[in-house]
C-alpha cells in the first residue's frame, strides 16, 4: 500500500525518509515544500520546485504504484499545485522506437522551460549534436542521452554530466515543465480574469501577453484555477496517510497561516484592492 507520512518540519521529514529507506521501502521520497508565503512576488527556489516535480512525475507516471512512500510537511496539504490533469497534459514521455521530429522536440523543450546549452551541467537544460540529444529533466537525478536513427529514437541512456560517460540504459524519459509558472501563465492567458493587470503591473502583463512567464506566477494559481490542488490530489486513493506529532504539526500550520493571512492583507493593500476584491 502506498504511504504518505506528514510531519511538522522538513528536518523531521528528512529523518523519516532515511528511516523508511532503512526499513526496506523500494522508493522513499521527500516532498519538499516552502516555508514562504504563497503571495510572495517570486517563486520558491528551483530545488524545491524540481523536488516536487520529481515526486509528482513519478505519481503521474505510475499512479497505481504500491511500493513507494512519500514524506512531507503539513504544507503539502495546502493548495499549492495545478490540478493533476493540467500537469499531465504538459508532460511528455519519450520511449525507444518513438518517431520524433527533432525540430518539434526542440520547440517542445523550449515551451517546457528548458534552456539550450552547449554542454549539459544542470537540471532544466538540453543540447543537440546531430542525431544525439542530451536532456537533463528537472524530475530526474541524472541527464539522459537520446540517440536517433533518422527520426526513430534508437537508444536512451543516462549519463554522468561531469565525465559525459554513458551509464545505464532506460526504457523511457518523462519530461515535465521546469516549473509551475508556465502552466499558470498559459491558463491566465486563456482566462484573462478581471484585475490581473493590476496584480501583475504593466511590464509583467505585457510579458504575459507576449507568451512569456513573468516571475512569481505561482502566487496567482488561485486565479488560474478555481481550486488549486494539493499533494492529496496526486496520490492514489489507496494511500495510507500517517500524521506524526499531530499537535506540533497543527501548531506549526496555524502559525504559518497567520503569517500568510497578514501577508495577503499587506499585498492587497499595496495593490489598491478594496475589501470585496481582497476576498
Q: Where would I find each of the regions flagged by the language model?
A:
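ASCE RecA-like P-loop NTPase motor cores
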Residues: 1-279
Amino acid at each position: 500500500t502506498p504511504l504518505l507520512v506528514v510531519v511538522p518540519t522538513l528536518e523531521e521529514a528528512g529523518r523519516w525518509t532515511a528511516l523508511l529507506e532503512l526499513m526496506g521501502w523500494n522508493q522513499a521520497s521527500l516532498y519538499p515544500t516552502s516555508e514562504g508565503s504563497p503571495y510572495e512576488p517570486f517563486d520558491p527556489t528551483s530545488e524545491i520546485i524540481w523536488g516536487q516535480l520529481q515526486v509528482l512525475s513519478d505519481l503521474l507516471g505510475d499512479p497505481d504504484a504500491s511500493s513507494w512512500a512519500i514524506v512531507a510537511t503539513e504544507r503539502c496539504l495546502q493548495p499549492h499545485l495545478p490540478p493533476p490533469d493540467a500537469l499531465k497534459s504538459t508532460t511528455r514521455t519519450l520511449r525507444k522506437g518513438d518517431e520524433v521530429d527533432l525540430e518539434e522536440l526542440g520547440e517542445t523543450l523550449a515551451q517546457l522551460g528548458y534552456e539550450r546549452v552547449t554542454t549539459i551541467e544542470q537540471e532544466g537544460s538540453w543540447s543537440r549534436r546531430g542525431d544525439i540529444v542530451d536532456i537533463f529533466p528537472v524530475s530526474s537525478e541524472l541527464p539522459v542521452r537520446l540517440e536517433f536513427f533518422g527520426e526513430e529514437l534508437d537508444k536512451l541512456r543516462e549519463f554522468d554530466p561531469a565525465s559525459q560517460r554513458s551509464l545505464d540504459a532506460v526504457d523511457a524519459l518523462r519530461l515535465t515543465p521546469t516549473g509551475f509558472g508556465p502552466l499558470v501563465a498559459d491558463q491566465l492567458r486563456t482566462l484573462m480574469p478581471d484585475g490581473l493587470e493590476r496584480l501583475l503591473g504593466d511590464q509583467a502583463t505585457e510579458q504575459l501577453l507576449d507568451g512569456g512567464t513573468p516571475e512569481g506566477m505561482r502566487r496567482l494559481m488561485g486565479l488560474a484555477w478555481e481550486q488549486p490542488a494539493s499533494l492529496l490530489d496526486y496520490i492514489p486513493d489507496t494511500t495510507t496517510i500517517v500524521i506524526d506529532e499531530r499537535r506540533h504539526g497543527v501548531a506549526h500550520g496555524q502559525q504559518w497561516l497567520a503569517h500568510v493571512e497578514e501577508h495577503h492583507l499587506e499585498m492587497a493593500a499595496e495593490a489598491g484592492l478594496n475589501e470585496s476584491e481582497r476576498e
